[in-house]
From Swiss-Prot:
Keywords: Amino-acid biosynthesis, ATP-binding, Chloroplast, Cysteine biosynthesis, Disulfide bond, Kinase, Nucleotide-binding, Plastid, Transferase, Transit peptide. Disruption phenotype: No visible phenotype under normal growth conditions. Apk1 and apk2 double mutant exhibits a semi-dwarf phenotype. The gene is APK1. Pathway: Sulfur metabolism; hydrogen sulfide biosynthesis; sulfite from sulfate: step 2/3. This is Adenylyl-sulfate kinase 1, chloroplastic. It comes from Arabidopsis thaliana.
Amino acid sequence: MIAAGAKSLLGLSMASPKGIFDSNSMSNSRSVVVVRACVSMDGSQTLSHNKNGSIPEVKSINGHTGQKQGPLSTVGNSTNIKWHECSVEKVDRQRLLDQKGCVIWVTGLSGSGKSTLACALNQMLYQKGKLCYILDGDNVRHGLNRDLSFKAEDRAENIRRVGEVAKLFADAGIICIASLISPYRTDRDACRSLLPEGDFVEVFMDVPLSVCEARDPKGLYKLARAGKIKGFTGIDDPYEPPLNCEISLGREGGTSPIEMAEKVVGYLDNKGYLQA
């Protein structure tokens, strides 16, 4: 840490955090990260430069530094871009957190209990010392997806964006819980394809429309039946149930949110996601 009020160039030596780069099977320690830093006039930390104006080498794991690898490519409408590699990878972040990053994709009709399950699951994993984050379908429309409507093309883009963000969370080693109606199989399958095999866990809230409509926690079914909401899933727009989801849950039998969350946690534990 840089001492408060430091004005001159400082040499910082940051040893590898325990559990990231060290293992019980390795007796000799890995190399440390050495960064040359200084404090600017506004108090912010910046990298210092060599006399020739270049940024000094940042020694990293086993002597490797962040690199720009691979040819220039075109992805969608983005041209002349290159993927930037870094020596700290997903496996290192997972060791730091002692868990494996993945996406728990909770899908189902409005009122099926998706958000309730997501919160119960988040709390249960938190109590186990596991780092999670919820991407809730309504919440993301307050910011990231506030520019999207509920037209078919915008709903597809909504799911695509959430899938990409969820992938980043998983790559960071975090257990990401995405809770969205996501009515179309093609959109959900596209999100699944973004992640390595097994890292996308689809949880289907298999609750009948009649039960969801009877609950109607937001009053949306009533508005849809009155014709005030068009294209509402389950009323005048289809919901396509998963064909091969990892977990299927239903509350018609009186199963509590805690019991459902325990089932998901049990699945994650059995698959090895709750340890690095």
